[in-house]
């Protein structure tokens, strides 16, 4: 779904004739960042390798939102003995660490771009933009519609979260009928 399609959805949902492009882009970027922070499955995961010395603070990448997992020296086991503060990380032992983290998406700058979050969250993104536009427009005083849009937005976020977690499962249990 492109930003233009999101704008068309918002205009149709609210019954407006026009919405300034700068607000569409601003709202899409704000909600996209919010969804990536609130829901791991909405954002993109990236890895970063650090060679660290014990007790030394090392800068995390500038696009890092949150560290999800850390592995030491190409181990398959999760390493948890580290501290994160103010965009820096400190380890209690020397070594090479691979950090898996959530990264900020690239912000959209044009109406023909597709937002960089998981496609499952695009409906929630559209409803969030509709809610923000209804709140921004001072002449739109229908609080019932605003609250309904907010409920739809939060419901769409939760639905997308459950759909994303269901799609991650590689195997599903199949019930077999009794043999006899």
Provide a role label for each language-model segment.
Residues 1-26, 30, 173-180:
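Short, intrinsically disordered N-terminal pre-domain segments
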Residues 58-75:
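Solvent-exposed beta-hairpin/edge-strand motifs
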Residues 24-39, 150:
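Amphipathic alpha-helical segments that form the core helices of the histone-fold
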